[in-house]
């Protein structure tokens, strides 16, 4: 599960760049 956290953060960061 912990290995998914960086992926989730990366996805949120990518979305934040669009907004």
From Swiss-Prot:
<feature type="modified residue" description="Phenylalanine amide">
    <location>
        <position position="19"/>
    </location>
</feature>
<keyword id="KW-0878">Amphibian defense peptide</keyword>
<protein>
    <recommendedName>
        <fullName>Phylloseptin-N3</fullName>
    </recommendedName>
</protein>
<dbReference type="GO" id="GO:0042742">
    <property type="term" value="P:defense response to bacterium"/>
</dbReference>
<comment type="similarity">
    <text>Belongs to the frog skin active peptide (FSAP) family. Phylloseptin subfamily.</text>
</comment>
<dbReference type="GO" id="GO:0005576">
    <property type="term" value="C:extracellular region"/>
</dbReference>
<comment type="function">
    <text>Has antiparasitic activity against trypomastigote form of T.cruzi (IC(50)=0.46 uM) in vitro but not against L.infantum. Probably acts by permeabilizing cell membranes. In vitro, shows no cytotoxicity against macrophages. Has antibacterial activity.</text>
</comment>
<keyword id="KW-0044">Antibiotic</keyword>
<keyword id="KW-0964">Secreted</keyword>
<keyword id="KW-0027">Amidation</keyword>
<keyword id="KW-0929">Antimicrobial</keyword>
């Amino acid at each position: 599960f912990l290995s998914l956290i960086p992926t989730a953060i990366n996805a949120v960061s990518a979305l934040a760049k669009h907004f």
